[in-house]
């Protein structure tokens, strides 16, 4: 958990009923209630990925999410509250949908996300603009189009916290772009992922 020099500045440990125990129960009523609040306010937008080439269309995941992975907004919320300084700048090299950016903006934390899909980043910016108009976000959410391997070394400054969700190799295939990790063979994927993670860590204070 992030610690301030002055204990009086420690962040709240109780985040809508979730406490920093060893096991987080995402099936608990309080957790589900908070996830519902976020999603009722439009925290996610999976439409740019809904027609990607290879989604998980079978089993429970295919039934509840149309085969598109969705980042848990309350998980993002507790991670930010517990591990990022108040107002800290978040870096996300595999941004995907808008969840982590919108949650950061709602909590008053600047956010910089990078994603290869221009359609997804455009959708994210549109959703963020809606949130700012509705008073749900303090702004400061930025999405950059491009390959994180190229973008990260060019970023200015340092970041306070790194939170991301890398591709699951070929479990979800987004495009045939040779820079797309989901289109790579396993060995190439691992090397590319390691390089991007190392570059992202290098940008953190």
Spans of features found by a protein language model:
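Short, well-ordered alpha-helical scaffold segments within catalytic/effector domains
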Residues: 72-77, 149, 190, 194-197
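Pocket-edge positions in alpha/beta enzyme catalytic cores
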Residues: 64, 68, 113, 181-188
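A short His-aromatic
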Residues: 55-58, 83, 154, 169-174, ...
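Conserved S-adenosyl-L-methionine
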Residues: 76-151, 200
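Short amphipathic alpha-helix with an adjacent loop that forms part of the alpha/beta core around
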Residues: 151-157
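Mobile active-site "lid"/loop adjacent to the S-adenosyl-L-methionine
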Residues: 158-199
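S-adenosyl-L-methionine
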Residues: 1-85
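Helix-to-beta-strand junctions that scaffold the AdoMet/dcAdoMet cofactor pocket
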Residues: 203-205
């Amino acid at each position: 958990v992030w610690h301030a020099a002055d204990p009086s500045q420690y962040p709240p440990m109780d985040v809508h009923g979730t406490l920093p125990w060893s096991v987080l129960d995402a099936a608990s009523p309080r957790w589900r209630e908070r996830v519902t609040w976020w999603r009722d306010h439009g925290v996610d937008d999976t439409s740019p990925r809904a027609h990607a080439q290879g989604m998980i269309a079978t089993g429970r995941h295919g039934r509840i999410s149309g085969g598109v992975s969705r980042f848990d907004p309350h998980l993002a919320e507790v991670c930010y509250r517990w591990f990022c300084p108040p107002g800290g700048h978040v870096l996300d090299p595999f941004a995907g949908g808008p969840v982590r950016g919108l949650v950061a903006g709602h909590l008053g934390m600047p956010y910089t996300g990078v994603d290869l899909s221009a359609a997804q980043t455009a959708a994210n910016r549109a959703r963020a603009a809606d949130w700012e108009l509705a008073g749900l976000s303090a702004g400061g959410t930025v999405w950059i189009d491009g390959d994180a391997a190229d973008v990260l070394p060019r970023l200015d400054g340092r970041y306070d916290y790194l939170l991301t969700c890398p591709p699951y190799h070929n479990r979800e295939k987004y495009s045939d772009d040779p820079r797309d990790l989901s289109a790579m063979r396993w060995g190439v994927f691992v090397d590319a992922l390691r390089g991007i993670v190392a570059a992202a860590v290098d940008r953190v204070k």
